[in-house]
């Protein structure tokens, strides 16, 4: 099952990608933020109203010795979050967390994206 995050306008979104060494034990991370009515940036993970801005962080500390296919999977997974796809437990989805062999969106992912952005 997919869960979606609400974007106000498609053309308001901005995603930045950072590839660096982080001491944490995650491969990749989607870090959404939003601007409030005063223009202040907020990183409150409990606010699901507008995550049209965000950073993707790829952790070289964890993935530097992994295959290029695995690195691509992590990047595609995090980009899925930037398109408002959440984790799901579908075995045939790039959005399933953990070790998977998929490094590109699968049929279910594409269907959910089409439904989300029509």
Spans of features found by a protein language model:
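Metzincin-family zinc-dependent endopeptidase catalytic domain
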Residues: 1-76, 82, 86
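Extracytoplasmic/secreted proteins, especially bacterial periplasmic and envelope-associated proteins
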Residues: 69-70, 74-78, 90, 108-115
